[in-house]
């Protein structure tokens, strides 16, 4: 009998694991770009495979969502946003509408606790309710000036079928005082489904927010609409920035009686017709292929993060980390007392070093990954001098007493073994320091090829990288070459790739020999001069 119980227990665990990501096997339909792949953003993705109701919200819900609007607004028209109308049944999210009396309705809503920002793909699988109410999956900025409507559907259309057969795919730009609203108009914003009401089946609704001036809309994996610069903000409500701010995700239903017919109290009381069902939501960001974007699966071997604000520029191929990025698959374990700044691009600062995360407190950055040995590169610096910055990994001190002058950016790296599926990086300040300040975290799995190559060149994995590493591009320069100081005239410089293959050989004609990087792909290389080797990172 005990064996039977154990078997049932393991079957239960297996089923729970299988259900953890209901979208497994469904490819992201948008193109992430050349050399890029999709990486799941777990802190805003959810299969809703848990039970949740008002007064009984598990961590699986509260870590990602709140059952209310971004502020105290209670909704448009006859809507009353109300927490009990947002619940889960163990496999789906229910966004319900119920009678509130006096012609009004209680309406379910959830808002993400974590923000997203372009480039990002977001998608839900959902079935809209059979009501005149709006069912919506959308995003909104804190200042309520930028809105993206991934989908807004009306399940029934009293007196006709026009709205029931069309899905609204749109966006808004606002001026709040005096209130001014722009959204694109015309048939292109209403996708027609061949005469079949959208309420009749589950559909996948997605949008690739590619950049501030490009939106791509997808339904059931097919691109159905593209919005470009001319339609984003023609009235210049946003001052030329486009849709550039970090934003919250919202899933809700609304009784939009300011322009739509009202649902009757009898209609609202019909539980067979008053629920907007959401099977899952998934969100992805494009990352460099070398970064091993996991598309929702395990196995990523490289993770590149550009630390800054919610709106500052991000280096191509990197993923944004701001002071509000909470640990899901990656992020800060505690965001309290972490600051962020964008110092701008003056004095030659590039998009890696112009923006920072900083704190006077000890804080942990965590990354989920497979077990193994990883090389971690961290870039320190700011426009102000910083002293005695320290980093520990997996409980072991790795970098100590890192100092940078004002405007100086220094990269240091180390290797660390991970055996619990999560890398923990601890950032702190020692005596005499005020804050730690970092611009980049780059985590790369150490392969047998790279380890063997280092050994062959007289280096070990424990050698201090600060004396043996170049970083390109230089924080203050963008020329397509790297300079090797103290070169011996008449000798040769040999550059190997990470597989140990020779990719370039240069005869030294100057004590500060310049090497052109034209044609070099992104990645890690090794420069050998007179038997001494150093890493060269091209990004």
UniProtKB/Swiss-Prot annotation:
Record-listed substrate binding positions: 73, 82-92, 96-98, 144, 176, 271
Primary location group: secreted
Record carries keyword Secreted: yes
Region spans: Disordered: 332-353
Signal peptide region: 1-19
Chemical reaction(s) catalysed: Hydrolysis of (1->4)-beta-D-galactosidic linkages in agarose, giving the tetramer as the predominant product
Enzyme Commission number: 3.2.1.81
Pfam families assigned to the protein according to its UniProt record, in alphabetical order: AGA-YXIM_GBD (PF21254), Por_Secre_tail (PF18962)
GO cellular component: extracellular region
An example Gene Ontology molecular-function term: beta-agarase activity
Keyword vocabulary terms for this entry: Glycosidase, Hydrolase, Secreted, Signal
GO terms of biological process kind: carbohydrate metabolic process
Induction (UniProt): When cells are grown with the low sulfated agar.
Active site (UniProt): 147, 152
The keyword Hydrolase is assigned to this record: yes
Reported impact of residue 147 to S: Abolishes beta-agarase activity
Localization per Swiss-Prot or TrEMBL: Secreted
PROSITE patterns named among the record's database cross-references: GH16_2
PTM remark: Proteolytically cleaved into mature beta-agarase A catalytic chain (AgaAc).
InterPro entries named among the record's database cross-references: AGA-YXIM_GBD (IPR049033), Beta_agarase (IPR016287), ConA-like_dom_sf (IPR013320), Galactose-bd-like_sf (IPR008979), GH16 (IPR000757), Secre_tail (IPR026444)
Family: Belongs to the glycosyl hydrolase 16 family.
Protein's job: Cleaves the beta-1,4-linkages between beta-D-galactose and alpha-L-3,6-anhydro-galactose residues in agarose. Cleaves agarose in a random manner with retention of the anomeric-bond configuration, producing beta-anomers that give rise progressively to alpha-anomers when mutarotation takes place.
UniProt subunit comment: Monomer.
Protein name: Beta-agarase A
Gene: agaA
